[in-house]
Amino acid sequence: MLPEEQLQRLYLAGFELATFDRFPKAVGVLRDNCVAFLVPGPDGLQILGNVGWRMGESLGPLVERQGRKVFVHKGEIVEATPERILTLERFRRDLKAILNERKS
């Protein structure tokens, strides 16, 4: 599927598309405070790095610190509550499903 078709499907599925100065070659995809950066790949758009929690103009990946799950970006920490983890998992699942769709 062409990148523009993937972006259209993401938009129609309720994802917000944005640009970020820190990632000029990527398209930011947001929903429910989750974010991923997409870049062109050999088979269409692909996720750059991890998906994570939006923290300012960047992404806080889910990590474990001192026995608890948190989202971290630079010195900032956001608690990874069970609700936030479920939201992130749903975001990742829905995003990957659309990116992996083949044109029928």
Cite the ranges covered by each PLM segment.
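Negatively charged, low-complexity tracts enriched in Asp/Glu with abundant Ser/Thr
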Residues: 1-32, 101-104
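Serine/threonine-rich low-complexity intrinsically disordered regions
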Residues: 2-3, 19, 41, 58, ...
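N-terminal non-globular leader segments, chiefly Sec-dependent signal peptides
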Residues: 7, 68-104
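Intrinsically disordered, low-complexity regulatory segments enriched in Ser/Thr/Pro
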Residues: 35-79
